[in-house]
Amino acid sequence: MRAANATTGAVRRLFLIATEESGDRLGAALMQALKTRLGDGVVFEGVGGRAMAEQGLVSLFPIEELSIMGISAVVRRLPSILRRIRSTADAVLGAKPDMLIIIDSPDFTHRVARRVRVRDPSIAIVNYVSPTVWAWRPGRARAMRRYVDHVLALLPFEPEEYRRLRGPPCTYVGHPLTEQIAHLRPSPAEQARRDAEPPVLVVLPGSRRSEIHHLMAVFGETLGRLQAEQGDLELILPTVPHLRDAVEAGVRDWPVQPRIVVGDADKKAAFRIARAAFAKSGTVTLELALAHVPMVAVYKAGAMEAWIGKRVIRSASVILANLVVGENVIPEFIQEDCVPDRLVPALREVLADTPMRARQLEGFGRIDDIMSTGAQTPSGRAADIVLNVLRKH
């Protein structure tokens, strides 16, 4: 076993792996929280992006190498991905850290973790962001006991799922979105705009090029028909800098033109005045729920992903906000249901003062208490558990 007490003055060596932008942000916040607690008594190595680099991490390779989505894309890149898994595991073993912290991206990070645990069991392993064992492949939870010492969960229902599935110890540390609530809730003037005419509809067709490819046509046709039936609408489409070109190309043939805004601040500003949202399923549904914006959510994948998904997904909903609230308050339209004939009536209903809209708002009103972490930030709670695992390992 390695030296176990973070208060002894020994320098802690931590190896972090985050291969997506969201994980990079989580990793950076965790690094900052650990530096607050340990000062110069911690050294970081690993894989990360821009945010973790700002905290001092020199990444083994650019995480953009792994920013792929979809089974067909993974198959094409499989040889290079497997090489990266092997080389990353070798780098961890060569660094001999006190702990390996794997952040999200389980198809990559868990393969690294398994290799490390087999070859050097003395390295503690913490998994930050639970794989979706509650949605599909529940057997992963029990298998993780062999190579994960603790899971840091972002969603409040996940620890109970790990207990039920006999997985490793799991603690809810909080979702980083809960730290943004003050920036998501409207001022009195913004609330007045929410209630004014024409209504603002926020349009969110996805955060990856593959998602935009699958959804832009159905979004455009749906919004054209909605405006023809509903009358005037103000459409705002938030995106990120590296997707702006794809979004602008995708809306060019739409019968109605949204106002495109770029960046997180403008996205939150749009949420604060939005009457409703039309969104691709994902983390953004939880962000909209925390902003108290009723929505219609959709998901449409490629043919192969859809075929597999129908056979393995076991959760009652694919919408994060529904899972957190504990009931399906947000209507979801998946694959063959993701068509204008179904979407237009749902959007009309969520824009109007209807029981469906009221039910969503009532559910969203409970989210603050459900997701609360008290006075401590999610990154602070995560850092404290990391240190506790180090003491015990």
From Swiss-Prot:
<dbReference type="Pfam" id="PF02684">
    <property type="entry name" value="LpxB"/>
</dbReference>
<comment type="similarity">
    <text>Belongs to the LpxB family.</text>
</comment>
<dbReference type="GO" id="GO:0016020">
    <property type="term" value="C:membrane"/>
</dbReference>
<dbReference type="InterPro" id="IPR003835">
    <property type="entry name" value="Glyco_trans_19"/>
</dbReference>
<keyword id="KW-0441">Lipid A biosynthesis</keyword>
<keyword id="KW-0443">Lipid metabolism</keyword>
<dbReference type="GO" id="GO:0009245">
    <property type="term" value="P:lipid A biosynthetic process"/>
</dbReference>
<comment type="pathway">
    <text>Bacterial outer membrane biogenesis; LPS lipid A biosynthesis.</text>
</comment>
<keyword id="KW-0328">Glycosyltransferase</keyword>
<keyword id="KW-0444">Lipid biosynthesis</keyword>
<comment type="function">
    <text>Condensation of UDP-2,3-diacylglucosamine and 2,3-diacylglucosamine-1-phosphate to form lipid A disaccharide, a precursor of lipid A, a phosphorylated glycolipid that anchors the lipopolysaccharide to the outer membrane of the cell.</text>
</comment>
<dbReference type="GO" id="GO:0008915">
    <property type="term" value="F:lipid-A-disaccharide synthase activity"/>
</dbReference>
<dbReference type="GO" id="GO:0005543">
    <property type="term" value="F:phospholipid binding"/>
</dbReference>
<protein>
    <recommendedName>
        <fullName>Lipid-A-disaccharide synthase</fullName>
        <ecNumber>2.4.1.182</ecNumber>
    </recommendedName>
</protein>
<keyword id="KW-0808">Transferase</keyword>
